[in-house]
């Protein structure tokens, strides 16, 4: 699709990376925030893809992330 979101819906960070694209060209992209690692498909509803529609109770700030008590580790890949 080549049209990345300008900010993360969860933490408003502006570093968004493209992780994957639809096997059917132009249908959807999978993108990820560079700060909170929130990941979404570009065809998800607005409450998952737009900061102004994202639920307030799930929004994070840079301070929230820095002061998180525990960030779960990513488990090793299965072989």
UniProtKB/Swiss-Prot annotation:
Transmembrane segments: none annotated. GO terms for biological process: catabolic process; response to toxic substance. InterPro entries: VdcD-like. Induction: By vanillate. Keywords: Aromatic hydrocarbons catabolism, Detoxification. Involved in the non-oxidative decarboxylation and detoxification of phenolic derivatives under both aerobic and anaerobic conditions, however the precise biochemical function of VdcD in metabolism of phenolic acid is unknown. It is not known, if phenolic acid decarboxylase forms a complex composed of VdcB, VdcC and VdcD. The term subunit is often used in reference to the operon, however there is no experimental evidence to prove the existence of the complex. This is Protein VdcD. It comes from Streptomyces sp. (strain D7).
